[in-house]
């Protein structure tokens, strides 16, 4: 399904505002698996690069295990290779000794057939091969074996607790894959946590921009919040760019990565990129559809579009309840043609120019309208300051038609639609004609807030404000009386390892668009909560007259 942004006239019909360190590379690139030499060059090599980030090891490996479900004939034309780093302290057996882990694995496997072992829960299955803490494994998928069998027979690669998020490590892996399993085309898949755009996740090197793939074996310099070292957009792009081959597509099996600040920094290292605006579901996707579609000889764009559909359909089949169709589900996938982002940038810059000028020099009524739109921006995750870009711009265009006229909005819609090759989102969202768009950051005078929620009952626990000068203030949320009211109490001051000027303002997105001008100027706080994190029910009125996006 190709999503098309509506013209401004159509928007008027339906819009409603909703209030250098040791790396995993070594001098010895010996392949731990003996490859089978193909009679002809393979159609594609899929390169999977993932780590557990402390608490998702079983989930990403359950997703990876789906590759073994690809059609047998697909393995004749497609290679699948992997590099996986086990968390240094995986949550599954965080409080157990190595001896206790081995004992439980033996107990779980006792008397079980191969099929029974493969049918185990994700956590129990992880115990069956219990990778060494902080070890890195490199191997190629052998369809004659199971993931468990391959993990048990694969020796750790490189140094223990290597820096998995070092660009050299990623480059080394891609080069090994291309040299050992050459193919006509290459697809890179990244698996772990996605951090959303956060300047405080920027590492010191190269004015980086985004956090993804969090290595629990290393710290990044934050005194508050997520301390794990991670890839930034620039360090990730450098790892891909320095490789000997260029992937035609990149799949980010990570949450929150369909973000403009990230996409602009990686747009030149691949032709197509697949990622999600909201959080994505692990363990119930359709990873096997990727080799099956590539083996069928489809062009990369068509194969990735089918992959998007297969994953979201699988999530729907597992999560959508036809007896309760109004039960909220928020998930999505978008396929972007990266070169089209170049045409979107000047339109976004013009939008920013008009917004900043109106806020500074417009009437009191215009400024109030802008504040109202900001206060009702649609957030995509509770914890981070990421907001739906198109909905925000649509609301501003609706409220300020004298500033953002029909002709301008239509130019924006055309450039926006050209970027999106294919998109699919939850059946629940589709039934409500609820579009899902790229995210971007919002801030107040350059300050943004990260919220810590109890994921069990979605109660707010704390909030950390990140200031442009690199300082932070964390306040604990204290419940009030029986009415449910609460208040913030100061907890501590801290720092993050850089400044707004050295992080956000060095992004490709900001250099092209100048969005930081608005982030530093805006004086209205955007919403602290998002519909998806609280499973917010969209309006259940008859939606039949609302045009399909």
Where are these regions (language model features)?
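Bacterial Sec-dependent N-terminal signal peptides
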Residues: 1, 16-42
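Solvent-exposed loop/turn segments at secondary-structure junctions
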Residues: 52-55, 86-90, 192-198, 218-219, ...
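Extracytoplasmic/secreted envelope proteins and their assembly/folding machinery
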Residues: 61-64, 68, 167-175, 233, ...
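Terminal, contiguous helix-loop blocks that mediate binding/assembly
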Residues: 33, 203-549
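Substrate-binding cleft of extracellular glycoside hydrolase catalytic domains
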Residues: 81-184, 198, 205-219
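Bacterial N-terminal signal peptides that target proteins for export
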Residues: 1-12
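Cell-envelope and extracellular/periplasmic
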Residues: 30, 37-60, 71, 85-91, ...
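Loop/turn elements at helix/coil->beta-strand transitions in domains of secreted/extracellular proteins
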Residues: 42-45, 74-80, 181-187, 244-249, ...
